[in-house]
């Protein structure tokens, strides 16, 4: 895997839905998506599951620790040589 798109998220399932939808229409497909839920009370797991057949996607949920540690958590679990970090509201 050459590229990993890491998406830290906290209580933003609608934004994650829009972001994942935009990734499905990319012509380049050589990337994985790593969504890391940072202790959300409004989870986006259902949204992520809807894209499992169209994206190479992984979902992780962890206790809230803030955006920096959440990005690092995603990076540690990614397989790409290059990391692209996109907040859910990009």
Give the ranges of each region predicted by the language model.
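A broad helix-preferring feature
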Residues: 60, 86-89
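Conserved short acidic donor-positioning loop in nucleotide-sugar-dependent glycosyltransferases
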Residues: 11, 23, 38-40, 65, ...
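Local beta-strand N-terminus motif with an aromatic residue
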Residues: 2-3, 31, 80
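Short aromatic/hydrophobic "clamp" motif used to bind/position activated sugar donors
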Residues: 83
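N-proximal low-complexity "stem/linker" segments adjacent to membrane-targeting elements
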Residues: 1-25
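Acidic donor-binding segment of Leloir-type glycosyltransferases
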Residues: 20-61
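Glycine-rich, basic loop-to-helix element that forms the pyrophosphate-binding segment
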Residues: 62-78
């Amino acid at each position: 895997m050459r590229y990993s798109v890491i998406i830290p998220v906290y209580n933003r399932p609608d934004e994650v839905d829009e972001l994942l939808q935009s990734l499905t229409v990319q012509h380049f497909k050589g990337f994985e998506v790593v969504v890391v839920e940072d202790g959300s009370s409004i989870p986006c797991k259902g949204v992520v599951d809807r894209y499992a057949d169209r994206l190479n996607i992984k979902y992780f949920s962890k206790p809230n620790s803030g955006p920096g540690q959440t990005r690092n958590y995603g990076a540690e679990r990614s397989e790409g040589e290059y990391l692209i970090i996109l907040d859910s509201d990009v």
